[in-house]
């Protein structure tokens, strides 16, 4: 089955500064924004609403991928969590044997329910990446959200 309405938002941060434990990761600047329905009156329902937040405003399934190379000052455990409207959905953990870079990837599919009018808690969905486990001194990251709507 082909995709009738494919949407992508990709953000990149090549200079993440220090982030404390439980802090939100800065997602950076938009490097790619694609909508096959552009100009057809169909809204682009993926947007960056803050330096650390991506907002999903229409029902559907969204593939989320966060990958980063994060620098730690000493041996530690680095954990990043995908947060949706303040609730942790998923997390991944990597260990660092000593000071240096830790590569971490967080893939997850997120569903946004369509009954926004009846239950406004469902929409919009604000996605954030939260640092847990250990503070970082810097790094780079890529955050990508895509969806395909047919019909």
Where are these regions (language model features)?
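Extracellular jelly-roll beta-sandwich "head" domains, especially the C-terminal globular C1q domain
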Residues: 1-151
């Amino acid at each position: 089955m082909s995709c009738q309405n494919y949407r992508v938002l990709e953000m990149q941060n090549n200079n993440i500064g220090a982030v404390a434990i439980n802090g939100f990761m800065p997602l950076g600047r938009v490097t790619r924004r694609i909508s096959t329905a552009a100009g057809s009156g169909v809204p682009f329902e993926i947007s960056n609403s803050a330096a650390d937040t991506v907002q999903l405003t229409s029902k559907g399934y969204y593939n989320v991928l966060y990958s980063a190379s994060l620098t730690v000052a000493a041996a530690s455990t680095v954990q990043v969590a995908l947060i949706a409207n303040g609730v942790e959905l998923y997390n991944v953990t990597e260990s660092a044997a000593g000071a240096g870079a830790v590569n971490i990837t967080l893939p997850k599919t997120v569903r946004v329910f369509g009954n926004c009018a009846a239950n406004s808690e469902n929409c919009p969905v604000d996605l954030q990446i939260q640092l847990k486990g250990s503070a970082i001194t810097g790094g780079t990251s890529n955050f990508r959200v895509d969806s395909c709507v047919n019909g």
